[in-house]
């Protein structure tokens, strides 16, 4: 819920008390449930950058959204807009190259049938000054 206002969770019978980033879940009568998330790729930004990231990219079906928190996305937030677009569509033309790589991987996986938790995952990283793609779990 924190960055997008979209909560992936499951309803609970009895209210629970959760604090911090988990509070929106409790307020909505939910417990966090990552079972609908599918790991699509991992990427580490190249050395020498001021800010480096070791990122895991996940996807979930929109039907997994159990609650929406209003007011999370606005001009002063990390995300100023949340939109749904088709993979390969024009709004993604200016996306970062790694984002395009990950979306292409998602598109390939969707083309083979339903997503699976045991699928091999590409790992993009730099080695010897070059971008390398290893496959984890293959």
Could you tell me what each predicted segment is?
Residues 1-21, 92:
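Conserved Nudix-box catalytic region and its N-terminal flanking loop in Nudix hydrolases
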């Amino acid at each position: 819920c924190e960055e997008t206002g979209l909560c992936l969770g499951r309803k609970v019978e009895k209210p629970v008390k959760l604090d911090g980033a988990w509070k929106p879940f409790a307020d909505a009568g939910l417990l966090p449930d990552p079972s609908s998330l599918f790991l699509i790729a991992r990427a580490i930004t190249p050395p020498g950058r001021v800010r480096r990231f070791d990122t895991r990219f996940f996807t979930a079906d929109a039907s997994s959204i159990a609650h929406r928190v209003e007011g999370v996305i606005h001009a002063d937030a990390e995300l100023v807009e949340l939109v749904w677009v088709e993979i390969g569509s024009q709004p993604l033309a200016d996306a970062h190259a790694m984002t395009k790589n990950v979306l292409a991987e998602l598109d390939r996986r969707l083309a083979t049938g339903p997503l699976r938790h045991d699928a091999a995952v590409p790992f993009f990283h730099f080695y010897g000054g070059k971008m390398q793609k290893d496959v984890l779990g293959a």
